[in-house]
């Protein structure tokens, strides 16, 4: 069989198209996890503990910023958010850098966020760091593990 220059070009274009398709397809789950994280932030801003709890898997766990206790079921999660919304009225969250890794049906999002709330008529902030672990459940990414802690003061 005689080598044709156009077959080389065609192979190059097809290989490039395949690589592009793979990279675009692999970007999807990260964006889905980012969207699930943003949904958590938007839902938190509604200050409705029942809605926030629905974003966690039935066996979801929370080690929250405001509590020394791990919350390991939906009733305990709800209790945490009821308290958080009382202690931090008008609670909102703004996300900083997010480092998202996807491992099949599991994903981890690690980063920092800043909580904003109103106290004595004044807006206050609480910078914190977080890790969310998500598991894919059908079309939804559910939170199975969430750790959040106040950002430590810089060393002196």
List the model feature ranges, each with a label:
Residues 23-27:
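Sec/Tat signal peptide C-region and signal peptidase I cleavage site
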Residues 28-51, 61-156:
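A beta-strand edge to alpha-helix "cap/lid" segment located at domain peripheries
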Residues 1-8:
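N-terminal secretory signal peptides that target proteins for export/translocation
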Residues 11-21:
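Bacterial N-terminal signal peptides
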Residues 57:
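Helix-to-beta-strand junctions that scaffold the AdoMet/dcAdoMet cofactor pocket
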């Amino acid at each position: 069989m005689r080598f044709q220059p156009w077959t080389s070009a065609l192979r190059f274009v097809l290989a490039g198209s395949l690589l592009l398709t793979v990279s675009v397809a692999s970007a999807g789950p990260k964006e889905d996890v980012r969207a699930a994280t943003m949904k958590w932030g938007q839902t938190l801003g509604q200050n409705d503990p029942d809605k926030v709890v629905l974003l966690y898997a039935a066996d979801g766990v929370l080690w929250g910023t405001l509590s020394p206790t791990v919350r390991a079921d939906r009733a305990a999660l709800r209790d945490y958010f009821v308290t958080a919304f009382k202690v931090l009225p008008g609670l909102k969250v703004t996300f900083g850098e997010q480092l998202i890794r996807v491992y099949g049906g599991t994903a981890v999002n690690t980063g920092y966020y800043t909580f904003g709330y109103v106290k004595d008529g004044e807006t206050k902030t609480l910078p914190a760091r977080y890790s969310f672990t998500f598991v894919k459940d059908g079309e939804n990414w559910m939170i199975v593990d969430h750790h959040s802690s106040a950002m430590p003061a810089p060393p002196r």
